[in-house]
Amino acid sequence: MFDTFDRLETFTSHNGDKAPLPFSKAEYDRRLASLRQIMAAQDIGAVVLTSMHNVAYYSGFLYCAFGRPYACVVTADACTTVSANIDAGQPWRRSHGDNVIYTDWKRDNYWRAVGSL
């Protein structure tokens, strides 16, 4: 019998090459540096962006939610998108930074993914 608790909650998939984004790497770096200055001044360790607009502004990834939540988590040294498994490796290819994929077979895997960053 298959134990459902052995299934992955999150994973990464770096398949294919990064696609061209709407803005340059330097522009995304500038945007993130500005946000990180505010974070440092307020002693904030991480920011979780959940609106489509903010995710796209800081990461370049524009998604269609299909009823599933997405995020961009910004820390002092990383910018990581959090995406649903339905998109496979596309979010990594189409974002400035890394990506973590959550599976939706178990409740709250999205929050586990966000919390892991």
Can you describe what each PLM-predicted range is?
Residues 1-117:
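A composition/biophysics-driven feature that prefers long, compositionally simple stretches
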